[in-house]
């Protein structure tokens, strides 16, 4: 069996997912991952809401999701992701009712991560002012480190893929 672990960014999303799973499969998700607005990568919030600080905090989302689960009578563990920085953060969320946390960005600089050493160093050296919200190629807001590539995209330059490696869908690529 495969565990179902949907990522949610609100109690409303958790409620909808629980209702849908129950209606169609007569089960609830095995766990929820709360991904707050401080997460790296793709974000489940509007870009304006993120940049204007109009998103719920991880604490607020956790409280809402736990309330939805409690209302249903289900026993679904919840893990918090996005902006979890250290052991103090981990302990805080567990004390607030989370089963645990999920951390990703902190592990980019490890030997086990297959990212390039240049990218790893950029992550290690990044300061708060180096991070920005962009519109990703799939159209979602995403957190990224400012770079010459982003500056070129801001200037209107476009790029075409030269080679695909395990793409999930077809993309425009340069066959030259």
Language-model features, listed with the residues they occupy:
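Short beta-strand/loop segments at the ligand-binding rim of alpha/beta enzyme cores
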Residues: 1-12, 69-81
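Conserved alpha/beta-domain cores
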Residues: 1-48
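Conserved active-site-proximal phosphate/metal-binding subdomains
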Residues: 37-79, 85-176
């Amino acid at each position: 069996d495969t565990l179902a672990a949907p990522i949610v960014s609100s109690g409303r999303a958790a409620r909808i997912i629980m209702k849908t799973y129950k209606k169609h499969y007569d089960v609830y998700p095995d766990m929820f991952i709360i991904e707050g607005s401080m997460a790296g990568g793709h974000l489940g919030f509007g870009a304006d809401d993120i940049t204007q600080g109009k998103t719920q905090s991880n604490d607020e989302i956790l409280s809402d999701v736990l309330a939805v689960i409690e209302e249903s009578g289900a026993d679904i563990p919840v893990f918090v992701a996005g902006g979890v920085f250290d052991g103090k953060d981990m302990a805080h969320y567990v004390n607030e009712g989370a089963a645990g946390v999920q951390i990703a960005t902190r592990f980019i600089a490890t030997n086990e991560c297959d990212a390039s050493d240049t990218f790893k160093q950029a992550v290690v050296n990044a300061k708060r002012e180096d991070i920005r919200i962009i519109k990703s190629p799939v159209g979602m807001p995403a957190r990224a480190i400012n770079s010459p590539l982003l500056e070129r995209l801001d200037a209107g330059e476009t790029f075409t893929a030269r080679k695909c490696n395990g793409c999930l869908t077809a993309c425009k690529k340069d066959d030259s």
